[in-house]
Curated annotation (Swiss-Prot):
Superkingdom: Bacteria
Signal sequence interval, chain numbering: none
Required cofactor names: FMNH2
Binding site for NADP(+): 48, 54
Similarity section: Belongs to the chorismate synthase family.
The name this protein goes by in its record: Chorismate synthase
One GO MF term attached to the UniProt entry: FMN binding
Keywords from the UniProt entry: Amino-acid biosynthesis, Aromatic amino acid biosynthesis, FAD, Flavoprotein, FMN, Lyase, NADP
Length: 366
């Protein structure tokens, strides 16, 4: 398995399995001299960890992070930063009934056909449990971006199943388990999830992420365009089946006179491009949306096959999120931050001294 590393200058390599002794990552390329403690990382991990409400998996993992290297006396040294998170609440017996069968919608079948072996316990390497070290690495990236450039990366749930969640205020996001920016919708979301859980079914979600304060110039055309790398990173998150940047698929119905964001001395008029033009950041907010599919592990009986190709019926009884999107907001934020820090360092390496006579305009003219 060779696809375990994200990034070019700021790289993150994850390791571990869902029911192994531990999971973690190695961060390479982090600039030296930044203050960093385990508490800086833990605050982000606590936003993602399981067992925080009745609407998510009841697997009780503290997700306590250990910094093993790369930090001396509370400051990054520029050497690889190793983060370790120990698994403490594995319950592998829940997966005994899928040793010889494949769960529909999961990576069981594809991992088996590709590698000829698979860790059936909680999905092994394909489990969303492996997003915890991504959030840990994202905490490091967020801190550097915020301190060096004033960049803020924030996200929220904008849709759960058939329920739209209109944005009201960022302050609402941290006050409920759904990361909803609209407190008035939370009771409806709770009732929806309670009914779904009783049915033994699952549902998808939409998550929106915004990076503000990103300067103009980040991105490496043509094959490492900023939006291309963002899309790749987001699609690397478990269960993500779609990515939009800016107006996204709504661009199809927009005319050029509407979609093209005009430039004025006072700033841009509109942001249909989502903060990226030609693969390079414009200085506007970078806006990203992801579509997350329904959880594949459900109690509803589903048709499948055994390893020998015979018909089988699969019911999954483990502790699973009825909607993985509920805990996806900090994961999506982290992925965006990891792409941004990598491109910030790449831009500094080649074009850090470039100056033009044209003034940098504001992200919004209003």
């Amino acid at each position: 398995m060779s696809g375990n590393t994200l990034g070019t200058l700021f790289t993150v390599t994850t390791f571990g399995e869902s029911h192994g002794p531990a999971i973690g990552c190695v961060i390479d390329g982090c600039p030296p001299g930044m203050g960093l403690t385990e508490a800086d990382i833990q605050v982000e991990l606590d936003r993602r960890k399981p067992g925080t409400s009745r609407h998510v998996t009841q697997r009780q993992e503290a997700d306590e992070v250990e910094i093993l290297s790369g930090v001396f006396e509370g400051v990054t040294t520029g050497t690889p930063i190793a983060l370790l998170i120990r698994n403490t609440d594995q319950r592998s017996k829940d997966y005994g009934n899928i040793v010889e069968t494949f769960r529909p919608g999961h990576a069981d079948y594809t991992y088996w056909q590709k590698y000829g072996i698979r860790d059936y316990r909680g999905g092994g390497r394909s489990s969303a449990r492996l997003t915890a070290p991504i959030v840990g690495a994202g905490a490091v990236a967020k801190k550097w971006l915020r301190e060096r450039f004033g960049v803020e990366v924030r996200g929220y749930m904008s849709g759960l199943g058939e329920i739209d969640v209109p944005f009201v205020d960022w302050s609402h996001v941290h006050e409920n388990p759904f990361f909803s920016p609209n407190a008035a919708v939370v009771p409806e979301l709770e009732a929806y999830m309670d009914a779904l859980r009783k049915e033994g079914d699952s549902i998808g979600a939409r998550i929106d992420v915004v990076a503000s304060g990103v300067p103009v110039g980040w991105g490496e055309p043509v094959f490492d365009r900023l939006d291309a790398d963002i899309a790749k990173a987001m699609m690397s998150i478990n269960a993500v089946k779609g990515v939009e940047i800016g107006a996204g698929f709504d661009s199809v119905a927009q005319r050029g006179s509407v979609h093209g964001d005009e430039l004025t001395p006072a700033g841009f008029v509109g942001n249909h491009a989502g903060g990226v033009l030609g693969g390079i950041s414009t200085g506007q907010d970078i806006t990203v949306s992801i579509a997350i599919k329904p959880t594949s592990s459900i109690r509803t009986p589903r048709r499948s096959i055994t390893k020998s190709g015979e018909e089988a019926t699969v019911e999954t009884f483990g502790r699973h999120d009825p909607c993985v999107g509920i805990r996806a907001t900090p994961i999506a934020e982290s992925m965006l931050a990891l792409v941004l820090i990598d491109h910030a360092l790449r831009h500094r390496a080649q074009c850090g001294d470039v100056e033009t006579p044209t003034p940098k305009i504001a992200g919004s003219a209003t």
